[in-house]
Structure formats: structure tokens, C-alpha cells
Design a protein with these regions (language model features):
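Short amphipathic alpha-helix used as the core "switch/output" element in two-component signaling
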Residues: 49, 71-83
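Non-catalytic signal-transmission and effector/linker regions of two-component phosphorelay proteins
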Residues: 1-19, 117-133
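The feature encodes the CheY-like receiver
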Residues: 66
Length: 133
């Protein structure tokens, strides 16, 4: 589901990819309220389709997705858009997952429940946009 953003941030397509529908939708809605054009999906393949169709700037990807691993999705997103800023979330901490995520170039690794304001701060800084309150 794609949510519209404000004109000054509409070029910043932000994907939220999480098998937890409620958490994913809430995070996408948080970013929409803050002026981003956010899209939520629970499946990695849907995220890839959206990435091909739009100007992908950032993605928040959970480690565990319905149809592929979050690590595999991040690698493929970076093939589509090498400059994409990726944050990864996880329901429980496993050092090997964080190490692997950092090796494939993620910007930030957060444990759930992740603070939406903190996630927004990381995304805004990466994109060079001013946070709105």
C-alpha cells in the first residue's frame, strides 16, 4: 500500500517491508504523517516490484519476511538502486544477523519494537531532509 507524501518529500520513496502487518503499516503511516511517500508490504518480491517502479531512496527491512530473508532482499534492492539507504529491524538480537546486515551495507540495525522517531531521525539524516514534527 502506497501512502502519499508532501510535495517536498515525494521524491523520497520509502519502503517498509515487514511480515508483521500491524508493525509495518504503523511505521509506514508514521512516515506518511511526517511527509514521506511511504509504501508498506509484507513480501520481499512486492518490495522489489515497487523498487523497480519508483525512485527508491530508503527502505526499512525486517530480517524475517514471508517469502525471502531480509538480507536477500537488501542485496537485491542494492542491485536495483545502489545508493538506497537501508535500515534493518529484528525481533530478537542475533549477532550474526547484524554482522551480515552490516556486511551488505545497511545504515542502521534496530531491535523491535523500534522507536519510530529514532528510525525517522536516521532516515532523515541519511536523505538529508529536515525532520518535521
Amino acid at each position: 500500500m502506497v501512502y502519499p507524501g508532501t510535495p517536498e518529500r515525494e521524491d523520497a520513496l520509502l519502503l517498509v517491508v515487514d511480515a508483521d502487518d500491524e508493525a509495518g503499516r504503523l511505521l509506514a503511516e508514521h512516515f506518511t504523517r511526517r511527509g514521506f511517500r511511504a509504501s508498506y508490504t509484507a513480501a520481499g518480491q512486492d518490495a522489489l516490484d515497487l523498487a523497480h517502479a519508483g525512485r527508491l531512496r530508503a527502505a526499512i527491512v525486517d530480517v524475517a519476511l514471508r517469502d525471502m530473508s531480509g538480507h536477500a532482499l537488501v542485496s537485491r534492492l542494492k542491485e536495483i538502486e545502489p545508493r538506497v539507504h537501508v535500515l534493518m529491524t529484528a525481533g530478537d538480537y542475533r549477532p550474526e544477523f547484524e554482522v551480515r546486515a552490516r556486511q551488505i551495507g545497511i545504515l542502521h540495525y534496530a531491535l523491535k519494537p523500534a522507536d519510530p522517531d529514532r528510525i525517522e531521525a536516521v532516515v532523515a539524516k541519511a536523505l538529508g531532509v529536515v525532520q518535521s514534527r
